[in-house]
């Protein structure tokens, strides 16, 4: 067990060392300061702006920004949907795959354009190289960049600046952050043994003399943006448990760190852009501590194993069901907490096989959305909790709620409440409908408490733009594809609209002079209260489904 926690500590140390560096770099990019990439990136950006007709307008209003984000995402989603439906007539199709069903193609396009990558299919048998590496890979960059752009706009608004130009932020997110890191990361994955080829499946002869076809493809460049952009959709059906996506411990370490580095770095970016690095670090350590607690719960649960099996064996054995031997229980538990905390959604083991503590932790991550949170939007969610904490503490002590020198009033609280309420609506309502008709709709493989967790996880993953699954569901059906699409859209775009209008409203407010009665938000006490508010609000909202799922399952095993 000690060796396992040493492995965890090493990965966390690398994260703590790299996230601030990237955070400072991202702050320089979006503050318009010079960076070492200027000579390479500026000509490319000028070409993109000139070719697309985008002008470097100083800033957009909230309505313009929202319209630009929604319309561009709609166009990209429709474009990719059409590619998927006509993939049989397009190039790079060595296995002769035909088009999927319309509802699966629709769900896939919505899933990738929302940065979720929830997969009701197995990539190597459903989509061509062109569909995966071209169409879906394209959305992996643009959906991640959309999230970063929204986060930066939100940070600008909170700090009293104009929210900016969506198209400019989108392009900068790709050319200055996602592309450079992906290029280096893909080379490292190639060195680690991840394939990158347009050749068809390899024909091999097994030890028994039979002929077998082994799927391969342009995996390395797909894999790195999958993790970096917190996309999570695997080139192969078993995702990062597949040896061609995640062949060894070096690749696993790289992919684990890379999925967390942008959301963790954005917290530092906020502190710099707000002119208050101390507050950025306090928030960073708050999230880090919550993250560490959840890792400990999941890891200990996997180490203790299944009580029923341990009773038969007469000794305690770790839970190795659904895990790759090369990673073991500890790295699988760490990955599970990281991928659900960051809304990446990639998996290196079967979440359906996690013990109840692991199921509790992964569901809690999806419900809270702030450890470390989704690509950009998770950072914004974190500051929504800060705004609500300021409001609540202001009410308790009789002070006018203020955040970063601007009053928190009715409009801000209404928008913040909408952002937080749409999440349970997009999860609990479809979950209730599905469980009301389990035989006709659900396709649940595990009845009872675990079956409830499976259904809730599917919709929580969709609404949180995560994409991982407990699996065990027959989810490539009309019901699952359409109902999950509802959760995908509601969980992505309603919060984005509300976040932008909240930020724009804050930017337009006149700053309030600091007085002796001003509540300081850059203190350890306030940060602790914020952590408490996050846990309490999450517990009040989702405690019933957690009790009916993993908690009840844990008691059932005793």
Swiss-Prot record:
The chain crosses the membrane at residues 2-22, 66-86, 135-155, 177-197, 253-273, 280-300, 327-347, 354-374, 378-398, 413-433, 482-502, 528-548. It comes from the Bacteria. The keyword Disulfide bond does not apply. Keywords: Cell inner membrane, Cell membrane, Ion transport, Membrane, Potassium, Potassium transport, Transmembrane, Transmembrane helix, Transport. GO terms for cellular component: plasma membrane. Its main location: membrane. It is found in: Cell inner membrane. The system is composed of three essential subunits: KdpA, KdpB and KdpC. This is Potassium-transporting ATPase potassium-binding subunit. It comes from Synechocystis sp. (strain ATCC 27184 / PCC 6803 / Kazusa). The gene is kdpA.
């Amino acid at each position: 067990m000690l060796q396992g926690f040493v492995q965890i500590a090493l990965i966390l140390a690398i994260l703590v060392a790299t996230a601030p560096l990237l955070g400072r770099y991202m702050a320089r990019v979006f503050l318009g300061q010079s960076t070492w990439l200027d000579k390479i990136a500026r000509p490319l950006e000028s070409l993109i702006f000139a070719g697309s007709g985008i002008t470097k307008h100083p800033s957009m209003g909230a309505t313009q920004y929202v319209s630009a984000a929604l319309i561009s995402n709609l166009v990209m989603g429709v474009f990719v949907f059409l590619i998927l439906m006509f993939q049989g007539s397009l190039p790079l199709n060595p296995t002769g795959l035909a088009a999927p069903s319309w509802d699966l193609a629709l769900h896939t396009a919505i899933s990738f354009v929302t940065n979720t990558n929830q997969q009701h299919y197995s990539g190597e048998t459903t989509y061509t190289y062109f569909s995966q590496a071209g169409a879906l890979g394209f959305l992996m960059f643009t959906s991640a960049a959309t999230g970063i752009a929204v986060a930066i706009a939100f940070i600008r608004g909170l700090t009293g600046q104009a929210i900016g130009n969506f198209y400019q932020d989108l392009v900068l997110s790709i050319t200055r952050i996602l592309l450079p890191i992906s290029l280096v990361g893909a080379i490292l994955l190639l060195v680690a043994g991840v394939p990158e080829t347009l050749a068809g499946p390899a024909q091999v002869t097994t030890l028994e003399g039979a002929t077998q076809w082994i799927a391969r493809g342009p995996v390395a460049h797909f894999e790195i943006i999958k993790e970096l952009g917190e996309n999570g959709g695997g080139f192969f059906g078993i995702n990062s448990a597949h040896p061609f996506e995640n062949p060894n411990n070096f690749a696993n370490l790289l992919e684990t760190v890379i999925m967390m580095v942008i959301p963790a770095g954005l917290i530092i970016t906020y502190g710099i852009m707000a002119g208050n690095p101390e507050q950025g670090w306090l928030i960073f350590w708050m999230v880090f501590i919550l993250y560490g607690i959840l890792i400990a719960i999941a890891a200990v649960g996997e180490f203790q194993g299944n009580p029923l099996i341990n009773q038969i064996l007469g000794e305690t054995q770790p839970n190795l069901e659904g895990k790759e031997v090369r990673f073991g229980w500890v790295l699988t538990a760490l990955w599970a907490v990281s991928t659900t905390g960051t809304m990446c959604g990639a998996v290196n083991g079967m979440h359906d096989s996690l013990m109840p503590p692991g199921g509790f932790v992964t569901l809690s991550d999806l419900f809270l959305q702030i450890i470390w949170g989704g690509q950009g939007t998770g950072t914004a969610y974190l500051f929504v909790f800060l705004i609500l904490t300021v409001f609540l503490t202001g009410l308790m002590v009789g002070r006018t709620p203020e955040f970063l020198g601007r009053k928190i009033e009715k409009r801000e609280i209404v928008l913040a409440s909408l952002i937080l309420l749409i999440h349970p609506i997009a999860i609990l309502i479809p979950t209730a409908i599905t469980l009301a008709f389990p035989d006709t709709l659900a396709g649940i493989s595990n009845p009872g408490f675990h079956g409830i967790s499976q259904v809730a996880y599917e919709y929580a993953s969709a609404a949180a733009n995560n994409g991982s699954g407990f699996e065990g569901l027959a989810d490539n059906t009309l019901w699952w594809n359409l109902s999950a699409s509802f959760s995908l859209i509601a969980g992505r775009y309603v919060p984005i609209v509300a976040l932008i209008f909240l930020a724009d409203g804050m930017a337009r407010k006149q700053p309030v002079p600091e007085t002796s009665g001003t509540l300081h938000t850059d203190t350890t006490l306030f940060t602790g209260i914020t952590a408490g508010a996050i846990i309490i609000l999450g517990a009040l909202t989702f405690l019933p489904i957690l009790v009916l799922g993993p908690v009840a399952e844990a008691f059932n095993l005793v």
